[in-house]
Amino acid sequence: YRFLLSQGAVGEVNFWRPSAARAFVAPRFSPFLFKLKAPHNAICGFGLFARYSALPYWLAWDAFGTSNGCPSQHEMLERIEAIRKRMGFRGAAPADHIGCIILVSVALFQQGDWIRQPSNWPPRNLTPMGYDLAEGEGERVWRECLERVPADTIRDTDVGDASRTGARFGAPRTVIPRLGQGAFRVDVTEAYGRACAMTDEHSLPVLDAAHIRPYASEGPHTTNNGL
């Protein structure tokens, strides 16, 4: 958190897990909140869930760089190995793969803007939890998140049933947020079955994503404009 906050506006973040054994499942572009553990017990920001993908750690670094929350690929690998050692990792997935929760439209809060975590969050719980953002503690936390960001931060986002924050936040829309370059690359790679569109090459180190209509020529930064 502190490293990403020091980088300024990050736009997209790869919230990785040291193991790719269990996929993270949520509605596309639903809110994903960052919660600090004890003694802070606070919400320090949020992003919108773009997708989950199991990736080699080097590809995660190549696609997202310091948006992985580390200043270098070497430090990222050291952190992965340290966490795996602490948790007694014995994964069935390829050893170099990590679980990547890819987030866009990320907003991080300064300490003075941290939000009190849900009052019904179980003590010592370290696993993700889902909340109805239309009522109760879910509604309070999400409302306070929106109060801390510019009105246009998620203006192009349809969070739909994932938030249901009420009429005063406007009716749900179907326009999705722009993907960052890393999220675009992973989205296109997965859309083509991790294979080259021309040669059917499946070697990830030689694959890259490109725009059909160049982004500089107002081509959309979306999966259907990629190959």
Residues of each region from the PLM?
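Compositionally biased, charged N-terminal/linker segments
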Residues: 1-28, 35-41, 107-108, 113-122, ...
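Short, charged surface segments at domain edges that flank catalytic/cofactor-binding sites
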Residues: 16-19, 154-198, 213-224
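Structural detector for hydrophobic anchor residues on beta-strands
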Residues: 43-45
